[in-house]
């Protein structure tokens, strides 16, 4: 293989990757190619930080595989939401992949540093840092990481998510209306 072919192949891959990112940014800002594929920016904000007052979650900085799974779950019906299901159904698989990559590349908020040695000042902090073992509830940090920064692709960051969104998700896990976790970990915890 000649150096010229290697350089041409590398340049082509760079251009394709850049085109993929541009498509993802377009979907985020303007919507997908199908009717009903509204722009993400409408609910999740220009920076992907969500809209706390309306309970729309932060998407910026979430792992691409996590975002892709959630959109695919909305599309298949294994995760239900009257707003997100029709939007996800209107996205093609390529659009889901592109927007997932763009969201993952957006900067996430810097979480507040929490030291395990600090005593929680309220019930929510106690649950997050220490859990409620008397009710067999592990600390949120056990799966979602210190300061809620997330662990891998399976345990998303909680830091920076609006409280109303987190409360709605816990309620959905508790009632069984959210069940897109193969092991139902959160269903048991909630």
Residue ranges and their predicted role:
Residues 17-36, 47, 55, 105-134:
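Electrostatic cytochrome c docking/interface patches
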Residues 8-17:
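Bacterial N-terminal signal peptides
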Residues 22-25, 29-30, 36-76:
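The feature marks the first
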Residues 42, 51-58, 73-116, 151-157, ...:
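Axial heme c-ligation environment in periplasmic c-type cytochrome domains
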Residues 37-46, 99, 137-147:
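The canonical Cys-X-X-Cys-His
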Residues 1-8:
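Bacterial N-terminal signal peptides that target proteins for export
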Residues 23-27, 66-69, 83-86, 98, ...:
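Extracytoplasmic/secreted proteins, especially bacterial periplasmic and envelope-associated proteins
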């Amino acid at each position: 293989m000649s150096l010229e072919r290697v350089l041409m192949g590398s340049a082509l891959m760079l251009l394709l990757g850049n085109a993929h990112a541009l498509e993802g940014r377009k979907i985020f800002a303007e919507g997908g190619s199908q009717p009903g594929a509204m722009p993400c920016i409408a609910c999740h904000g220009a920076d992907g930080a969500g809209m706390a007052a309306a309970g729309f979650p932060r998407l910026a900085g979430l792992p691409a595989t996590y975002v892709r799974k959630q959109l695919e779950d909305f599309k298949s019906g294994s995760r239900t939401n009257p707003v997100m299901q029709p939007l996800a159904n209107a996205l093609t698989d390529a659009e889901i992949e592109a927007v997932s990559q763009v969201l993952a590349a957006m900067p996430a908020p810097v979480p507040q540093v929490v030291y395990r040695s600090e005593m929680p000042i309220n019930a929510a902090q106690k649950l997050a840092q220490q859990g409620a073992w008397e009710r067999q509830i592990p600390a949120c940090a056990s799966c979602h990481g210190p300061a809620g920064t997330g662990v891998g692709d399976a345990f998303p960051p909680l830091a920076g998510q609006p409280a109303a969104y987190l409360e709605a998700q816990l309620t959905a896990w508790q009632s069984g209306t959210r069940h897109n976790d193969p092991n139902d970990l959160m269903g048991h915890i909630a």
